[in-house]
Amino acid sequence: LGTNMAGDPDAVASIAANLGVSPDDAAGMERVMTSAAHVGAWKWCFWIPSAIAFAGAIGLVVFLRDTPTSVGLPELEGTETRQVKTEKKGAEHKAFLMKYVFKNPLIWILGFANFFVYIVRFSVLDWGPSLLSQSKGVSMSHAGWLVAMFEIAGILGMLFAGWATDKWLKGRAHRTCVFCMAGAALFVFLFWQLPADAPIWLLFTTLCAAGFCIYGPQALIGIAAANQATKKAAATANGLTGLFGYASTLVSGVGLGFVAQHYGWNWAYVGILGMAVVGMLVFLLMWGAKADGYEPEAE
């Protein structure tokens, strides 16, 4: 979508055949060339995502509910916070937020970790096509597909990370994030070391493996923050950690571009790899933490 194919004889011939237009038909071939050029099609690259986002917003307004009790359901077992009644709009609620969010070192650790997770992720999303074409000799069309597959692999990584957290790590999402960041660092390193003439399938495999690993922490940080801050401060905790995530675009966007332009893509790879390693180390700071912050309140 949005790619000018008018210069590709095979594409033009295919469109003409599909439309039943003879090469001798000047008016018909003009329509074929217009179709091949995708005149104005680039606009749909904005309209389609916007329409999907708008439909999602309508769905949230219609179907999203506040709490289980608001629809007549019981509270989830183990999520009671009896000691601090946050329904009150006052000093008591502020004290709750200060204790469970702003003075909670685990929330700040998750925020700092999110900063590095987003750097690794957006380094590929923002610079992936340029990085692949200039450092690995991949055509821009193939580079676009590789970045798209990086995202798709990330979706699978999210699902696996969530399942593994519940299955093997007893809900300790921060521990899953340690393993995911280690995996992301490993596959970024392997991708970097591949020669420019490496088979496309090998580039595909290593890049997708990195995406599989890096999207796990991106999904789990919000869950971990909500669990540590408890349901009464989950939104505030997610807002704080999200602030760190989006602040990282200064590094992944401007910083990485500066490094690549002035020092080459090898140093850009070093930067991405370094961010993955630092992110892993930050997650390690809370390795011994419990899965959530509810237990002290369940007395």
Please describe what each predicted stretch is.
Residues 43-62, 267-285:
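Symmetry-related core transmembrane helices of the 12-TM Major Facilitator Superfamily/SLC fold
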Residues 166-181:
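Cytoplasmic membrane-interface "Motif A"-like loop-to-helix N-cap segments
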Residues 1-14, 36-37, 132-133, 164-165, ...:
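Interfacial helix-cap and linker-helix signal at transmembrane-aqueous boundaries
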Residues 182-196:
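C-terminal ends and interior cores of transmembrane alpha-helices
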Residues 3, 99-159, 218, 252-253:
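Extracytoplasmic gate region of multi-pass secondary transporters
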